[in-house]
A protein has these predicted regions:
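Membrane-embedded alpha-helical bundles that constitute the cytochrome b-like, heme-associated redox core
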Residues: 1-235
């Protein structure tokens, strides 16, 4: 199994599989967030079910490992590609025909996404799962009853226009990263015939758009709600 680490193909395969697993997590996370739009009580029930329970902690650790593996392999492959190009990377050349902008800027997009994840961990994970782990039951935030009040935290966070703008920039970067990464991962694991090439790109764009819009709708909804005094009925 050493070829997974030592060979370029092996590294790409590991990065592709870890990326697809992270996309599955994003799908679950987005679906869970949308619950808050229909019932904050149901959303908080889901937050309470997850919380700091052993299965949620195991899942969180597994997710962290996937994320670290994906980042490390992305960094290694980027360095490998730059080394292979040598001094050519400093030459000013036209964009190759058929090469997406996202594919040429995956590392830059990845940096923005990582920064966004740290922001997200600060705003939510640290105030929810981590707070439960350390026994912090009072977050000291008006309108938020405790670590399992996920809806209250969403409402509080996205009432701040700075966070709204930062999250939307993050989601925009995520769209570009996923729209290329999704079909590229499928291509790497074997879906690489000519018939499916364009189909996969189309499917990836549609699926990525659904995920990103799902997250963005929650951000925008709660921001508008805050502008309307806490209820859309007052707008």
């Amino acid at each position: 199994m050493s070829w997974l680490i030592k060979s370029s193909i092996g590294r790409k395969l590991v990065m592709s599989i870890s990326g697809l697993a992270l996309i599955l997590f994003l799908t679950f996370h987005m679906s869970m967030n949308l619950v808050a739009l229909f019932s904050e009580e149901a959303y908080n029930a889901v937050c309470g079910f997850l919380g700091a329970n052993w299965y949620a902690l195991v899942a969180s650790m597994g997710l962290a490992v996937l994320f670290i593996v994906h980042i490390v392999y992305a960094f290694i492959l980027t360095l490998q590609n730059r080394k292979a190009r040598g001094n050519d990377r400093y030459d000013v050349v036209d964009k190759p025909k058929g090469v997406e902008w996202a594919s040429q800027n995956m590392m830059a997009l990845g940096v923005i996404i990582v920064l966004g994840i740290f922001l997200h961990l600060f705003n939510f994970w640290a105030k929810m799962q981590l707070a439960e782990i350390i026994g912090q039951h009072d977050l000291g935030i008006d309108g938020v009853t405790g670590p399992t009040d996920g809806a209250g935290l969403i409402r509080y966070t996205f009432s701040n226009p700075i966070f709204v703008v930062l999250y939307l920039i993050w989601l925009g970067s995520l769209w570009f990263h996923l729209s290329h990464g999704f079909w590229s991962s499928l291509h790497t694991i074997g879906f690489n015939n000519r018939v499916w090439f364009e189909r996969l790109r189309c499917i990836s764009n549609i699926y990525t758009t659904i995920i990103v819009l799902g997250f963005a709708v929650v951000v925008i909804y709660y921001f508008i709600q805050a502008l309307c005094g806490g209820s859309l009925w007052y707008c």
